[in-house]
Amino acid sequence: DMRLKTLIMVCYGCGLRINELLRIKVQDIDGQRKTILIEQGKGDKSRYVVVSDSVLAQLRCYWKMYHPTGWMFYSRLLMDKPMSASTFRKPLRKHAQACGLKHCNPHTLRHAYATHQLESGMPLHQLQHQLGHSDIKTTQSYLHWLPELGHGGIDLLASWSKQ
């Protein structure tokens, strides 16, 4: 299902909250600047989020198939209304279970985005902006100790052992 695939890719690929995802308007997407305007996110704050090339390509395919004019993800019953949260949550949960994932919802996609971006080296302040957190401490909650990455520091005593 092209709609579900696109919803998943945008949610995970941008780290959006479900309400931010479902309230994207076609005009909010700027393919040239590779951004999406998130209007009135949590706390009624607006921000721009960076969009990857793969997410933009998927959005273009989706647009060519569905031709949305207002809401990017509109209700199938009322095109002038955004899709409801349950219309995304239910098929996401169903497909995740079919893949063997026990707990998958839009927030777990957001959490995975944050964790994976930190693992790949995204600076904490950039992630804070992307996620729309007003307090850096909220973003820091996505930091996990990952033994496979080592501690990321240098050996401060390496030069001493040569003396």
PLM-predicted stretches and their roles:
Residues D1-Q163:
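Conserved catalytic core of the tyrosine transesterase superfamily
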